[in-house]
């Protein structure tokens, strides 16, 4: 069992996807996403083969260990350490913009965590360090910050769901929170799941840079980004694990961010009430007045 004691702070951070790969503010013509995905994988795999992390500290934690992942090169006294390439896991992820492009997304599980695991549109509380492949940090927070997984770079969202938050926590009299048995990991994000050709202008991230994040996953909360009463996990109508492409009324606002999903003039929040005006919490029981199999909040003629 391990613990961490923190005071909560909330920050605006460069991982936030306001500069993500699907925006058009950068005038540099983009590279071919398929070709770039291949180049990115090779670059990341070379990094993983030539670097290691402080796994021995996790195996036998020294007194006062902070459970932070530290990555270093396999040189000098470290040449016989176990390379990251022999310790990471991976998953295949489809590109958000071109569905014929796939990425092999590598991540390291130092600690799984024993609490709840976030869904892809949830709100998480994390500590993190963001680095380039030269291990130069471009962003970090040593205090817990809230990350809306629908608003961070896609690679971070895709890895966070593979971990669990803290198994328990204690609110201390001094206003701090002590977390126990939380997830600890690292992710190695290809540019196509990061910022691609449009990194935040205020950051030190180059175009097409592969990203490394080390993190501690402390808490997770169910997301309802538009506040309509339908948890965002249930706004993924096609069930593909992505929130961006579900737009029932074709108004260019995805359902998870749309307070009137069917654009019938009645807010979604008013179409998921029972006969007593009480909000229904089970999506399987949402009203379907005309019995056509489509719940009223997604049915413009109901």
Describe the function of each predicted region.
Residues 2-9:
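Sec-dependent signal peptide recognition
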Residues 10-12, 48:
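Enrichment for repetitive, rod-forming helical segments
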Residues 14-17:
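C-terminal motif of bacterial Sec signal peptides marking the signal peptidase cleavage site
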Residues 19-302:
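Cross-family detector of peptidyl-prolyl cis-trans isomerase
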């Amino acid at each position: 069992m391990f613990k961490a004691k923190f005071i909560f702070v909330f920050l605006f951070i460069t991982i936030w996807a306001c500069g993500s790969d699907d925006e058009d503010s950068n005038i540099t013509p983009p590279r071919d996403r398929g070709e770039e995905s291949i180049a990115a994988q090779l670059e990341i795999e070379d990094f993983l083969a030539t670097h290691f992390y402080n796994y021995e500290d996790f195996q036998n934690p020294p007194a006062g260990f902070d459970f932070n992942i530290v990555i270093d090169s396999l040189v000098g006294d470290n040449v016989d350490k176990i390379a990251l390439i022999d310790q990471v896991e991976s998953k295949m992820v489809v590109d958000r913009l071109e569905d014929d492009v796939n990425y092999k997304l590598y991540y390291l599980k130092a600690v799984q965590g024993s609490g709840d695991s976030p869904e892809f549109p949830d709100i998480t509380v994390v500590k993190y360090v963001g680095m380039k492949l030269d291990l130069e940090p471009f962003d970090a927070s040593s205090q817990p910050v809230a990350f809306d997984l629908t608003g961070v770079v896609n690679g971070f969202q895709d890895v966070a769901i593979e971990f669990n938050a803290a198994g328990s926590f204690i609110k201390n009299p001094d206003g701090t929170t002590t977390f126990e048995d939380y997830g600890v990991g690292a992710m190695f994000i290809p540019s196509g799941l990061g910022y691609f050709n449009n990194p935040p202008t205020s950051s030190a991230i180059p175009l097409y840079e592969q990203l490394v994040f080390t993190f501690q996953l402390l808490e997770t909360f169910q997301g309802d980004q538009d506040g309509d009463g339908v948890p965002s996990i249930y706004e993924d109508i096609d069930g593909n694990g992505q929130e961006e492409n579900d737009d029932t009324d074709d108004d260019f606002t995805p359902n998870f961010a749309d307070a009137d999903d069917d654009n019938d003039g009645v807010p979604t929040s008013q179409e998921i009430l029972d006969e007593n005006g009480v909000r229904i919490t089970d999506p399987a029981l949402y009203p379907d007045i005309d019995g056509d199999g489509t719940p009223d909040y997604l049915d413009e003629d109901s």
